[in-house]
Amino acid sequence: KLTYDVAKTSTHGSDELAQIITDAYEQAGEFGVVSHERSYTDETYIKKVEGHPVEAGFTNEMYINNPTYQTCEFDNPMVLLSMNQIKDYNQIAPFIAKAFENNKRTPVVLFSEIDHHVENIILHNVSEFKFPICVVRLPAIGILQREIMNDLSLLFNCEILPSVPTVDFQGMEEKYIGNCKSIKIGANDVSFLKHDNFENDKVTGKINELNSQIKVNDSETEKIYLKKRVARLTGGIA
């Protein structure tokens, strides 16, 4: 009722807009984020992002496997996170081999900057052998990028690949392999769902930490950014 009353006042007494805003907050949940954008139709509507949103996208349209929606979609993929440019295919070869272990064809999603020679090898495998893989460009830059990637490492339950390109991953691949129930990758947005039985106390701890920072922060810009991080971790955004 309070949300509706505030929304009605903000929209100059519009019952319709007040109800839409109220519904959006209910759908986003306690820790979710509600934002607004210009509609390209005459309709005002709610668009809820299912799962955990990331402001990123595929690096090449050849990764698209759902032409209707122009997205790349995988169930139960192997996820790799790297803060550094992949300059040699051998840096990811052990994980590609892992994806094909025991005659499996596990989809691979790689969040990383990648040398064009390495990506050409990957795209050849996609084109010639229908290898299920997608390279996703890193979100944001600088400190913001590191914070987002650290959040993703909690949600995918894996470590970020080290910066040393000569590291031998043989026998220690598991700790760098993340996973999720499903993922949808577009040109400019990514969303994924965690497994139903996912539990990670570190995620809860990070959410509590961010909410504490929101309460004491005086900067509205910083608060918005922190709330987006909370929304990503909780999976609530409308």
Feature roles, as predicted:
Residues 1-238:
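Long, structured protein-protein interaction/assembly regions in large complexes
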